[in-house]
Curated annotation (Swiss-Prot):
Keyword Secreted in record: no
Subcellular location: Cell membrane
One cellular component (GO) term of this entry: plasma membrane
Similarity remark: Belongs to the AAE transporter (TC 2.A.81) family. YidE subfamily.
Molecular function terms from GO: monoatomic cation transmembrane transporter activity
Species of provenance: Actinobacillus pleuropneumoniae serotype 3 (strain JL03)
Annotated TM spans: 4-24, 29-49, 65-85, 95-115, 161-181, 370-390, 403-425, 438-458, 463-483, 492-512, 529-549
Keyword annotations of the record: Cell membrane, Membrane, Repeat, Transmembrane, Transmembrane helix, Transport
One of the protein's GO biological processes: potassium ion transport
This protein's name: Putative transport protein APJL_0985
Domain of life: Bacteria
Cross-referenced Pfam families: Asp-Al_Ex, TrkA_C
RCK C-terminal domain boundaries: 190-275, 277-360
Membrane association type: Multi-pass membrane protein
Amino acid sequence: MSDIAIIVSLLSLVAVLGLWIGHIKIKGVGLGIGGVLFGGIIISHCTHLYGIELDAHTLHFIQEFGLILFVYSIGIQVGPGFFASLRQSGLKLNGFAVMIVGLSGILVALIHKLFDVPLPVILGIFSGAVTNTPSLGAGQQVLTELGGDNITAVMGMSYAIAYPFGIIGILLSMWLIRIIFKVNIDKEAQEFDNNQNQQKEGLDTLNVRLTNPNLGGLKLKEIPDFESHTVIYSRLKRNDQLIVPNVDTVLNVGDVLHLVGEKATLHKMQLILGEEADVSVSTRGTIFRSERAVVTNENVFGKKIRHLMLKGKYEVVISRLNRAGVELIPNGEMALQFGDVLNLVGRQEDIETVRAIIGDAHQKLQQVQMLPIFLGIGLGVLLGSLPLYLPGFPVALKLGLAGGPLVVALILARIGSIGKLYWFMPPSANLALREIGIVLFLSVVGLKAGANFLDTLLSPEGLAWMGYGAIITFIPLIVTGFVARIYGKMNYLSLCGLLSGAMTDPPALAFANEIKDGHGAAALSYATVYPLVMFLRIILPQLLAILLWTAS
């Protein structure tokens, strides 16, 4: 067999064995994707015994390419919600997540100095202790540029030794906080639901009868606050006739308007217009329909709603716009993006015409545009390669192959589309790309680390590494957990999601979700902190490597 055939065969064997190991669960907890690392270690141990040599350059390429695929697909997945998570309710959650990341970085520096742990070893322990694989890749890359020898193997070993307690430590932290604070799970779930219902600002509807005589005879666009675009006037009922109003529709006293907007805004408009009307303005039984359509036509990407002139040409109103699961109040200045779901109100034939304009081709939501993917990856690699020179630093700071594609993916996913290019990926395609990338990366890390793993694990040095990893895992989690619970008054279920997200650990999230079956509190806080934490976990090992290298 050729060298390439041998490597591909072994990688496939590692993936099969590792994924099988990852699916083994004890008390509902398993290694998950981390099992691939241990599959690589086992196969590497066997190849070492039989004297099989693998080409280092080929392995290095596969490792780096896998990492690029993984971080890029993560960025595309979380990009739409990344910047939103930094605002409003996400501020507190992200603040505590930053606290966990910061404490772990401080502990790394202290252990490195106090116990004289080699830099490659402590960075590998750090990545394993926080169960973050891209962190390992970022650390390996910057240490290689600093001129270290045998970096990949040493970091891979220390990562693998610290990894198991990285998972166990999160679960232990959740359990201890629950015991110490005597948490009642049902009560916590109820309090979370009550709080969410109070804070929720979804769109509501209200039927208002126009009784203000000062507004009779005015056009719709002339009524107060119309230009603020905070309310949509989707239907108008005059006597028994239902019509779709446009900006030039003249209002009569007694007209019933169907308004869409936030509850507080609707109440304000009711005070201006008149009184709430207990009248049905349903399209059922009329010539009008209310239907949903998806924006998939590349010719309308980036176009403002007012440029489509839907009201003027087709007498169709967009009453709601759903973007990435968030309901928005559409206005004329809002630009359409691929995947936007529009709620259309109008005659059936007019709605069909509008459907043809915006696309509404649901099969496109399952198709993958390959050009934007490789364009994004290329831009990410270029960004990651740009050096930032700082005085006193021995090497330039770089985002690297882990950080560059992540940052570019976050930005492109937030933008959504440029011209006919769109950066939407179906969830199934994104998951496949992400899993292939991480499997390739962990397989190679395991193959490089496995030759001496067992000897190191059973040595006093290996036991010390496990201890250091336990400290880096446990102390930031338990300290932040106590602070968040006592001073932040954080809900326990949200806190469990925060701890899982701060360690970017899906197995821990699965455990947190099972604390209260069918409840979404943990998943919500996990998703809120995940994007920022992933970015910090990639940047922090590079900063630590350069700072500690410079100080030594």
